[in-house]
Amino acid sequence: MKTLSVLPLLCFQFSPRNVESSIKYFLVQSFRAAIILKLALMQAWLYSSWSVVKTPKFFISSGLIMALGLKMGLFPCHYWFPDVVQGAGFLQGLLLSTWQKVAPLVVLGYVCKCDKSRILLIMGALSVLVGGWGGLNQTQTRKILAFSSIAHIGWICVLISYSFRVRVIMFLVYTIINSRVFLLRKEFGLTSLSMFGRLLNYNPVRGVIVVLGVLSLGGLPPLFGFLIKFLALECLVYEGAFFLRFILVLGSLIRLFFYLRVGFKRRLVYFPQHSIRMFVWRRKILNTRVRYLYVLVLRVLSGLNLLGILSSPLLVSFLKK
C-alpha cells in the first residue's frame, strides 16, 4: 500500500525522468514484497508461525533482512536508490529518503530484538563506506543526497543491535537536517554543484545557510549532525565494537570530504559572473499563506540544525535515563 501510494507522487510532474524513476521504484518494491511474502509463507508452512520477533531459522531471518535492505537501499541492494532519487523531484526525494524508511526500520528492530544480526551489521557498515565512496565523483545534488541517505541509514541499522534510543534520536535528527537541505535546494534550484558557487555570489547569506546545512549533514563539529554521530560512537565504544566504530568513522570522513568540497571548493574556483545571469528569473509565485508557512518551516529547521553542541546536555540526559 505504501508503494502504490508513493507512485502517483513520483510521477506527479509526468516527465520522462519521473516516469522512469516511478517504474524503477515499482519494480524494485514489487520484487521486495514478493521476497517477504515468500519468506512469510515458508515460515508459516514449516513452523506454523507468522511472527517476525524471533524467526526460528537463519536463512529466513537473513532473507527478511536482505529484503528490507533492498527496500531501504542498503548495500549490496543500493544501486536503484540514487537513480530513483535523481529522477524524482526534491520533495519526492525527501519522501523516499525519510518517511519510506520508517516501516522497514521498525520491522528490522523487531527482527533483531532478541540477538544481534551480523548480516545487518555488515550491511550497515558497508553502506556507510559505499555512501562515502559513491558521492565522491558525483556532480548532481540529488545523487549526492541519495548516497548520503544510504550512509545515514547504514549508521541507524548498525545502532539497531545496540541502542533503541540512540537510533531513534539519530533518525529524527537525520530527518530534520535532510528536510532542511532538500527544501533549501528546491527553493534555490540547486540541481548541480556549480549552482552553489552561483548562489554564494548571488546571495552570500543564503549561500552560507545552505553550506551550513550541508556540513551539518556531513557531521562537521559543532553542528547538529556531528553531535548525534558522537553519541552513536560513544554507544559503540561502550559496547566494545571498536572495529565497527573504525569503519563508520572512515566512511563518515570520506563523506565529509565531498561535503567540504561542496561548501568551499565551488566558492574558491568558480569563475566570477554577473549576478543577473545566476538564476532563472521566471519563478512560480506561491500563495501568500503557503509562502509564509514554507518560510516558517525553513526557519524552524535551520534553528534546529544550528543548535549543535548547545543541545548536547539535553540529549545526554535523555540517553542516561
Question: Across the structure, where does each feature detected by a protein language model lie?
Answer:
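Alpha-helical transmembrane segments of multi-pass membrane proteins predominantly involved
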Residues: 1-321
